[in-house]
Amino acid sequence: MNIISTRMAVQGVVGASFHDPAVLVGWMGCVQAQDFAMAKWGVGLRLGAGSSRGGGVTDAAVDAAFNSGAILRTHVLRPTWHFVLPADIGWMLRLSAPRIRGFCVPYHRQLGIDAAVLRKSRKVMLAALQDGGFLTRVEIASLLKRAKLDTGDIRMNFLMMDAELEGLVCSGPRRGKQFTYALLASRVAASLGGSASLDLSGDAALGELARRYFLSRGPATVNDFAWWGGMTLGQAKRGLEVVKGELTAAVFDGVEYWFGTDVNAARPGSGVAASLPAALLLPAYDELTVGYTDRSAILPPAFEKASFSGLKPAVVVNGRIVGIWRRVVVKGKVVVELTLFEKVSKTAMAAIEKEARRYGRFLAEGVEVRVTTGRHY
């Protein structure tokens, strides 16, 4: 078994069988999304985006799923934003909020944010949003200031994160390029209609998170799961214990990995053998990198620093990160700029350029995507 090609298969990067952003996010459990534009591409490349044969999701389609509330965005698992389903946001918050709050404690102390401040902040937000409306961060900050709450420095970041962790607010639809917030209860009710959200806690929640993780990201280790889930190793082991009967274990280089019993059948609709694409342009914070604490299956040690531990947008050739990329707009045209860490063959460069064109079709901006190379090796 090739670890990285199998991960690509179960994540839908190879032989994409998903067609709906919400179905993909549900399969993955959560998708890291602090860089919104990059996170949308991460969803898109798993939905056949930009296929030269036509079809596949576009950037606008992922936007539409987000704006409709089919997928939500909040701080969950770790102290950063993730895409998550309305049906899952409640139990995932209950599971992960206590540890994220622990991360916030020293910052609250430094910024003078105490329990009274948090209670008042939540009360203001609840009153402002209780009619089912949507407000931008700037609009909420204005209301907090009117209530004599200091939003300066980075205080506003932590006041909003607290409201998210409390299960009070989550993402609303974008207003132009601005993000809005809504009451989580209203957003979930509108999205689910009469359907019930999952009601999980304790080991049942740990087990469900483990199930989502290992089926959609295996082969992976229990340490990988602990990292991704923002939990202790003990919690990760408890979650794995709940679902290990549904998984298979194998040892590679002395390390135990867990994955779906049939890695090709584990992904809905999949019958595609795991294989490596010639090239990929992975977004920043992609789940093929950020989903694991050990990234050596895709990231050569020599490139760890230059790629920011694989978290920068990555150029991947035959399953290995060989460079980074960025999107810039020059005279109204999208340009994909490459920085390669090693020489690549003409065949590989052609595959990279093909991926850049695919990205352009995903954006659907009707502009030419050019590839410039700034080699640093």
Give the ranges of each region predicted by the language model.
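Short amphipathic alpha-helical interaction segments
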Residues: 56-64, 150-162, 233-240
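Non-catalytic regulatory appendages
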Residues: 242-302
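Glycine-rich, small/acidic residue-mixed loop/short-helix segments
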Residues: 301, 306-377
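Short, cationic-aromatic polyanion-contact patches
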Residues: 83-89, 175-194, 257-269
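Phosphate-backbone binding and catalysis cores of DNA-processing enzymes
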Residues: 1-138, 142-152, 302, 335
